[in-house]
């Protein structure tokens, strides 16, 4: 049993619906000589209801149905899993989405043969490395081939052929006195540029036409003789219709009467008269309709001599009667036959 590696199996809550996936994972781990000594749900570890021991497991396997590119794992648990692993322990089940968090928590990412994270040994990371310092070589130091290093001499002042420069003589420069009058250059004011206007020929032609039409109208009114006598309004009225009123009132087609409608603020009593007429019409419409004996015989088929009813099918039975027929439920009978309870006692 000691040859098996101790492992921890973390399960996503969605995997609980497929227990065969858990069994297959355990079988694959057993083939690699890994035995899961503990098995927890990831949400239990996330909410703190379960705590892990430090440096207890050699392998931690996270089982989830999510794709590698869609894995959602609490980042705070990466450090918890790192503490629970032994040095050189492996974490399986996460992807490169949390690559930065893995490097921060001391994991080394392995891509081959299987993708996993390996916890690096902290003792090796904290070891100090001594770096030997090289001694300064002298001029007599020889190279590995046996030849000496090249030497360089400092150039002397006598052997240097650098160019020489002389300071300029300020005495030869022109001196400007304050008494000398300085005349600034004169400038002439530029003349305004000429502006040339380009006019379309079509616009000029239209303007000429408008001007000619206006002038022709003015000439026409000048030629009109204003001395002519104006036409009087009375001359426009015919002699036959001069004595008759031109305004007519529309008469009713039925009553042949001419009646004016009452004004909105009527004070002559016409509005009250119209209201009375309207009330009379409404009262006639509200009267209860009463049937005479002759009218009742047309709808009551039980009277002698009346062979049919209102719909003509009441005597045939319920299958032929209307929904509001008063004889619903009674057996079929002959038209004109009196109905009593003795005749239907067998059906009751």
Swiss-Prot record:
Residues the record lists as binding [2Fe-2S] cluster: 252, 263, 266, 268
**Alphabetically ordered keywords of this record:** 2Fe-2S, 4Fe-4S, Cytoplasm, Iron, Iron-sulfur, Metal-binding, Mitochondrion, Phosphoprotein
- Where are the stretches annotated Fe-S binding site A? 252-268
Please report, in chain numbering, the residue ranges of the motif Cx2C motif 2: 322-325
Localization, per the record, is:
Cytoplasm; Mitochondrion intermembrane space
Q: Which cofactor does it need?
A: [2Fe-2S] cluster; [4Fe-4S] cluster
What InterPro entries does UniProt report for this protein, alphabetically? Anamorsin, CIAPIN1, Dre2_N
A single GO CC term for this protein reads: mitochondrial intermembrane space
Q: Where is this region: N-terminal SAM-like domain?
A: 1-162
Residue ranges annotated as motif Cx2C motif 1: 311-314
Q: Where is this region: Linker?
A: 163-242
What biological process terms from GO does the record include? iron-sulfur cluster assembly
Residues that coordinate or bind [4Fe-4S] cluster: 311, 314, 322, 325
Which Pfam family, any one, appears in the UniProt record?
DRE2_N
- Where Phosphoserine occurs along the chain? 206
Which terms does the record give in the GO molecular function aspect?
2 iron, 2 sulfur cluster binding; 4 iron, 4 sulfur cluster binding; electron transfer activity; metal ion binding
Q: Enumerate the residue ranges of region (Fe-S binding site B).
A: 311-325
Q: What is known of its domains?
A: The C-terminal domain binds 2 Fe-S clusters but is otherwise mostly in an intrinsically disordered conformation.
Q: What does this protein do?
A: Component of the cytosolic iron-sulfur (Fe-S) protein assembly (CIA) machinery required for the maturation of extramitochondrial Fe-S proteins. Part of an electron transfer chain functioning in an early step of cytosolic Fe-S biogenesis, facilitating the de novo assembly of a [4Fe-4S] cluster on the scaffold complex CFD1-NBP35. Electrons are transferred to DRE2 from NADPH via the FAD- and FMN-containing protein TAH18.
Q: What is this protein called?
A: Fe-S cluster assembly protein DRE2
- Taxonomic placement: Eukaryota, Fungi, Dikarya, Ascomycota, Saccharomycotina
Q: Which gene encodes it?
A: DRE2
């Amino acid at each position: 049993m000691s040859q098996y590696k101790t492992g921890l199996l973390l399960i996503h809550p969605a995997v609980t619906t497929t227990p065969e996936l858990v069994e297959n994972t355990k079988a694959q781990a057993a083939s690699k000589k890994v035995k899961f000594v503990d098995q927890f749900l990831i949400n239990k570890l996330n909410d703190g209801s379960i705590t892990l021991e430090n440096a207890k497991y050699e392998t931690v396997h996270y089982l989830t149905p999510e794709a590698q590119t869609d894995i959602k794992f609490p980042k705070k648990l990466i450090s918890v899993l790192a503490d629970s692993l032994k040095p050189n322990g492996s974490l399986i089940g996460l992807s490169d989405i949390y690559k930065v968090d893995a490097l921060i928590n001391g994991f080394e990412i392995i891509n081959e043969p299987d993708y996993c994270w390996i916890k690096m040994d902290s003792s090796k990371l904290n070891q100090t490395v001594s770096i030997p310092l090289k001694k300064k070589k002298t001029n007599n130091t020889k190279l590995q081939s046996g030849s000496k290093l090249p030497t360089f001499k400092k150039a002397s002042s006598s052997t240097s052929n650098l160019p020489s420069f002389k300071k300029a003589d300020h005495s030869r420069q022109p001196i400007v006195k304050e008494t000398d009058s300085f005349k600034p250059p004169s400038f002439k004011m530029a003349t305004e540029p000429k502006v040339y206007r380009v006019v379309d020929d079509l616009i000029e032609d239209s303007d000429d036409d408008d001007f000619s039409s206006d002038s022709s109208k003015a000439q026409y009114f000048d030629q009109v003789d204003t001395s002519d006598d104006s036409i009087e309004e009375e001359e426009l009225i015919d002699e036959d219709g001069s004595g008759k009123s031109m305004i007519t009132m529309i008469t009713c087609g039925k009553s042949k009467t001419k009646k004016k409608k009452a004004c909105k603020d009527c004070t002559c009593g016409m509005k009250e008269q119209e209201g009375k007429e309207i009330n009379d019409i409404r009262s006639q419409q509200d009267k209860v309709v009463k049937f005479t004996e002759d009218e009742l015989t047309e709808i009551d088929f039980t009277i002698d001599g009346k062979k049919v009813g209102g719909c003509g099918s009441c005597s045939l039975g319920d299958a032929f009667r209307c929904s509001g027929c008063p004889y619903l439920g009674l057996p079929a009978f002959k038209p004109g036959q009196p109905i009593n309870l003795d005749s239907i006692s067998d059906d009751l």
